[in-house]
Amino acid sequence: MPKTTKNKNKNTTPKSKTKKYLESANKKSVTKPKKEQDKVENLFDQPFLGEIKKNILKKTKSFNSKKKETVKSKSKSPIDFFDETKRGVFIVPPETDILSRRELNQKTVVNTVPNQTSSYPTINENKLVELNNQPETKVLETKKDSFTTTIREKKLNPEDSQAFWYIFVGDRKYGFWKNHTWVWLGYFDQLQRWNYFKVIETVEVPQEHAAFIKQRPADIDFWRPLVGNPNYGFVQNNTWIWKGFFDKKLNWIPDPVRFTEEALGHTDSLVDEIEKKTISEQPYWEQENDIVVTVFNTKSLASSLENELLLENSSEEQPVIEEVKPRRNEVIFRNPVTKLHFEKEKFEFLNPVKETNETIPLIEIVKEEVKVESEVEAPVEIEPEAACEPETTIPEVETVFVYEDDLKGLDSNQTQAGNVPEVETVFVYEDDLKGLDSIIKDDQQHDEIAKHVEHLSQDYSKEIKDSAKADLSNISDDIDSVWKEFGSFTDETQKSVEEKSQVDEIILDANNDFINESLFRDEVVNNIDSQINETVSEQQFEPTYSVNEFQQEFSEPVVSDEKIKETNSDESVNTDLTALFSEKLVNEVLLTNEYVDVNAPFSTETEVKVSSELPKSELVDEITFINNDPKPQEGLEYKVDFLETEPKSLFDEKTTIVVESEPPFIQPDLSLELDSVNDVDKSLETKTTSVELNHEEIGNEFINLDVSEKEVQEQPTTQLETDSEFVLPTYQIVEDSFTESAETPNEFSSEQKDTLEFISQTQEVETSESNVPTVEQETKLFEHQDENNLFTPLPLDLTEIIESNALFDSKPDEKESSDSELQPTFKEIKLDSTVEVPQESSQVEATFDTVQPEAVFDEIKTQELQPEATTEVVFDDHFQPDVQPEQTPQEAKFDSPVEIPQESSQAEFHAEQISDEIKLEEKTEAVFDHQQLENQSEETVVTPTEVTAFEPETIETQLEPSSEDQPSEPALDQNHPEIVTAEVEQIFDGTKLEDLKLEEANFDNVENNEVQPKETEAEITFDETKELQQETSSEPLSTEELKSEATFDNVSEAESEAVFEKPQLETQTEKILEEEPKSEPVDQLITEASFDTVKHEAVFDKNQTQTEGLEEPQVSSEAEVVDQTTTDTVGEPEAVFDVQPEKTTEVKFDDVENQQKVISEPQVEQQPGEAVFEPSAEAKFDSPVESVQDSQPEPVLEEVQTQPEIQPVESQPEATFDTVQPEQTPQEAKFDSPVETVEQPEFSSEPTQQHVESEASFDEPNYDFDEPNYDFDQPSYDSDLQPSEPQYDVDEPNYDFDEPNYEIESKPSEPQFEPQVEQQPGEAVFEPSAEAKFDSPVESVQDSQPEPLLEEVQTQPEIQPVESQPEATFDTVQPEQTPQEAKFDSPVETIQEPQVSSEPEVVVQPNFEERKPETVLEEPQADEIQPEASEEESLDWELLVGNNSYGHYEPDGEWVWAGFFGDDQKWNKDATVKWARERDYLPLIGDEVYGRYNNKGEWIWYGFYDESGDWVLVDEQWKNRQPRINEAPKFWEKLIGNEEYGYYEDNEWNWYDGEFDSEGNWLVFQSEETENLNEDITKDIPALEGYDIDSIDADEWLSQFSADDAKDVFGSNDKK
């Protein structure tokens, strides 16, 4: 963890410290110097933490051990890695403790500079920006003694010199973990400003270490195989240098620091702004006017860069910039060096080794130079030895830095004085120019000097030959004015130059690279410092030129306010300078060090050409600056091919930045600007050479070591600055800037912001497939984080990531699971007798083994209903109606009219949609009991076309699944399957979502109206059936389609007039219809489509003819539909009817007529779960009904077909259960066709009792039609549809399990709801005979599916006045009950009891209703399903939470509804609300652009995909994407609800008395009160006596007791 100093304040918490720190930063106050006690490792020794440790009541003992371990690890500082003395030799990868941002936020982050006092201002990025925008900004005042630690100090305190960016590791704003590697989303420039990548760069994250870690995690030397791997480091001077480091968890963390032109340009502007400000007193520079002219050979400069002249600049003597008025009108380049750019020549960085190969002792050069300089008129000529010329490929371009003072004192001769080889960097220091007053006086001379500079820049390829004479007359007028401002120079300048020349030795490393001992050796430093003191004036200026400009061929001299124009100096002068510089820069650098030892910034400027080592120095910044030795430093080293590129205005930007950022860091004497200049120079030099930057390089590695030259150049500079004292200041700056940036986002350019956003959105964390964390691995992650910090994202193996939690909380999974669970699978459902329904449309024949619906529903539930996939549904005779609501299709038992809440059906069932999706053709095929057929034949006309349309898709797709899946109501005879088919068809025809609403009609009414089912049947229209057919045909495979199929188009009575072939059905239907005709509305008929008729297997003659062909296919398709719908229904909790007729009973058929009219069609649509099935009229719901049932957990019994035409059936309040009873939890409504499901519950209550006996056989047939469970639902729907009018007695259960039903099965896709049901959803009456048969199926359906939809079952999607439907709700059917719970209260009982007596009128036609599994038809309507719940249901909407059909969970765990419940309790789906399935998120798990892992390893999403597929962020903090040091993830939010941390009281979460420590450990404070409380507890709980309560883990303690023991301890009443 990064070692950052922290003010230790026992009285303040870390949070308060952070606030104080931020406030002080805002006030531009300097933080107090770091003290020993402020170290992170000492933080935990503070009394308040110690006290907490003693008094806390840990929930888990492991927390304590982990905490202790963590504390111990903190005490370990990576001294070896950061010890400068070992950097050149240390090979073991550095291991560092990364201080998480959270922890950092809780602790005061003080400047890491040890000797810094709070009296000094803190320079941050905001300050820099401010300076940049306000040239007149005053320079912060600093005291002489306020300077950053020297390199030597850093050696002594390596901990304090850690990279500033350590604290950002683990912060999701800055990067993400990938395969045990921290991947940065951007980089830090030399100003330590964070920059997001503008373009997502190809990040080649090293992967090798992850493999080694996995193979031998305990192997300390796991890194050895990585030595030599270019992804992890590089070799320099036979030393392996790491580009990053490994943290305690062996995660690889690269260095994010880069040198950028952009940052340099910023420094330039800052420099210009600062020019008017004087450099603070520099203890060694006593002469204000002294200007030192230092000519550096590029070679020597490069080599010195290896040695890091910047280090010299950062030497203890560095002056700190103070606010001083310019002396003598010195507008002098505020930066010690006036930047003269060589337009034609590009500065190139030499390889430090090459550069150092030949070095001529600077002493000689300096001597010559000093001599020349001493001659005011004659430029100092330094003839480099033969070695003077760079052996390396150093460009011949000379870089001349002229300080204002230097220019003042320079004569043209002096300008010539430096005879440096081809490339020369000329730094003119005040001291050097002090004696050149005469030159300054001569404007022409000044011009000449300028010309020299310009010429040198132009003729970099030319070596400056010895020429002591340089014409300064060519210097630009600007320079003249500047010189004038400077004033005359004294001879002291010459003196200083001479003194500089006195240096006798050049220190070279093994590579012949110049070693600047001034920084490292006290003796040398002393010598140089003394010389500098004499030679350099306090007013040294950092170079104003920017690296960019250098790279730009130094096209323009950058002289801030004093615009010095570069004039072509005489070639001779250039030659002289070139010759002088061609001498090894090392020598010159040495001189420079001697000259400006304290004036390191000048030397830095001189070294503007930073060799690659400059980055080293930055690395060193963590510990030391680049080793003076050319030896590579251990820190990361950037191999800067890009560094080799021309430096661009490195100095300027650096200088400016340094001035602002370094003041707290710069040694008191040296100005910040000078330091920055030095750093810049080194950075340039680093360019010439490969840059070693431990951390910097790591950062680059993340990006890729190969960076543009600009970046390289810039990076070295930054590194130097950071490596020198500037690093610590930079850290402060970064911190402040980020902190402020949080407040002032404008700090980041909009471009950066865009980049950040782009990155955040586009950056994908590369994770192995295992990146999706599993629950098990979540635990691992949690533990892992406990070891580290809960606050820091733990680098996870790909496996870990995969194992970690899914995108959303478990909730998204729950949705999908609910979908799958809710959707009954019918594939295993088998009916002993296979009914082969003639399929006009290609519909799968549903073979109905006489299987009890329950068994079928179970399997159906497991099977996702796939409307498209049509499979034969075989109902085993053993199929049990008892089905879990979700499994309803198979298990649903139509004990009483069981509504199978069909999730998808409820949501999706709309008469229109269903008809569209489910082809009514099949519905027309629906076989109605002859009675119903007769009655419905008049009113209920099943449009063959609709049926046909409905049949093909629904039947094909759904019938088979329904037949397979349809458990077939218990005791379904092989004949019953046929009947079931008819029922299903009726249900679909009659019931739509609206019909389902009819279903809501009280089943009591249905019972009362059961006498009317015949009329209803007669009236049954397949309008809904048509719609269902249409829907089914259009979308036979989708749950919605199934639902739509389940619900019938409310076909006009004429259309819905389906005659049940079976005489029994006809007889019963006739009776019922006779009463039902009262409610003639086809819609009602459809809604009321009585499953009774369906049960009777009677096929409407008209419909049969048309429908029969269709019905048979429909039965198959319907079964298929049921499967599909069930599948969809699983997705949609809607019409899942627990084969509990009681809920269906809730549907009141009294209002059936109204509902039938209003609701029959609309209801079906609106209330997919409410498919209302009129027992008689809709008795025959062909495959559509079955399919609906399949789609809906609740059998199509709702008789989605509830034929609105049967509105007259009001007497028979055929509570058409919209197979889609949205109110019923879609999840519960597993039967895709909620309508059928609803109806069944209704009918099931009464007819179940009546027809329970017959239902045993009919149920299976119903399932045959319905996709297993829907058959059950259908009967209940029938009862719902018809209960109001003729509430058929159990007698009506005598649904003829006649093959007509099977024929109907062929039609199941177009279940025809008898008009009765549609007419009066409240009255939904199931013909006793039909229902009797459906009763068992209904029971099974109900068992399998909750029938909350039953009330809504009145499938009259169009008829939204569901209110009437609720009236029609059968008491047995309780649609509002959660679809899962949807139980047909009385209907279930009724259904369970073969006797329909409870609701005699409600005749559950087991065949038809079971066939109603066609509610699957409504499956397609799952989206449309409008959970239309009765008033009771409205109270159960909470049960729908988590049902994917009704909404979804956001990443933050918030449940978002996909619609709303209207006043009529109908579910109104909001088409605009869409969400992505979890599978859409799985590939993103582990990508920290999209989320993060919390302290328990759970994946937390930042946003979600909206309906347009766009990623929408919900984390406001993340939206800004601006790093905030004090920003900590709200990991604790996920702990809400965890009883280990608190408890709920009055629906409000209360935390235990405690808090999270910096590591995310939960600390429960124990006060005296708690101790007393514990004492009281011991009294209450004698078993606790004798225990050390303070150390007791309650959970652990309780775990040793059994339930009986707990009773003994806590009492029999307390089961806890």
UniProtKB/Swiss-Prot annotation:
Location of region: 2 X 32 AA repeats: 1205-1389
Ranges annotated as biased composition (Low complexity): 938-952, 1309-1323, 1392-1406
The protein, known as: Protein P200
Region annotated Disordered, chain positions: 1-41, 878-909, 931-975, 1004-1083, 1100-1132, 1159-1433
Function recorded in the entry: Could be an accessory structural component in cytadherence.
Basic and acidic residues composition bias: residue spans: 1012-1029, 1059-1081
Superkingdom of the source species: Bacteria
Sequence repeat ranges per the UniProt record: 1161-1186, 1205-1236, 1310-1339, 1358-1389
Keywords noted in UniProt: Cytadherence, Repeat
Annotated S-S bridges: none
Pfam families per the UniProt record, alphabetical: EAGR_box (PF16713)
NCBIfam families recorded: EAGR_box (TIGR03834)
Region (2 X 26 AA repeats): 891-1389
InterPro entries referenced in this protein's UniProt entry, alphabetically: EAGR_box, EAGR_sf
Any one GO BP annotation for this protein: adhesion of symbiont to microvasculature
Biased composition annotated in UniProt, kind: Acidic residues: 1256-1270, 1288-1302, 1416-1433
Stretches with biased composition (Polar residues): 1200-1227, 1242-1251, 1276-1285, 1353-1380
